Amino acid sequence: MRVYLGSDHAGFELKTFLLEHLSTAGHQVVDIGPHAYDAQDDYPPFCLETGRRVVADPGSLGVVIGGSGNGEQIAANKVAGVRAALAWSLETAQLSRQHNDANVLSLGARMHDAVTAAGFADIFLATPFSKDPRHQRRIEMVAGYEAAPGPQVLPTT
């Protein structure tokens, strides 16, 4: 599987680790950057480009990495068609794919050691979307809003 990796300075070391780990596991890994450590770099360009590449390459997935993973997830989710999920456990990584068909995983390098974070990436990449109609319906609701934002019809009880 093709996997796009993007980070900032806080995620640089983990990105380097994941590049090797995922390549060894047989994935075709594309390093979006940064390609050198720069303590002053900003995550948005790397995360936005990672998201853009994932959307433009059906069947691929992405991983964005920062200190907490929060800003990186927010940035990636600004790309139309991206469903980026912040993982903090094996279960959240797995469910993001299984229930939400997430196509970008966000990781906090300051929150997890490299081996734990690699486990999150492994399960994310290995888990297929369930295609359960209720999950598909919810994804379509969000995509519909993305295409035409506006007031929502709220369900009545």
Give a label for each model feature.
Residues 1-24, 28:
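Glycine-rich phosphate/diphosphate-binding loop of Rossmann-like nucleotide-binding domains
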Residues 2-6, 10-11, 90-157:
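C-terminal binding/interaction regions
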Residues 6, 32-34, 87:
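Conserved beta-strand termini and adjacent loop/short-helix elements that scaffold enzyme active sites
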Residues 15, 47, 72, 117-118, ...:
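A general structural signal for well-ordered alpha-helical segments in protein cores
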Residues 25, 79-80, 100:
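Short, structured coil segments at secondary-structure junctions
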Residues 28-39:
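A short beta-strand-loop structural module common to alpha/beta enzyme folds
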Residues 46-87:
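Helix-adjacent hinge/juxtasegments
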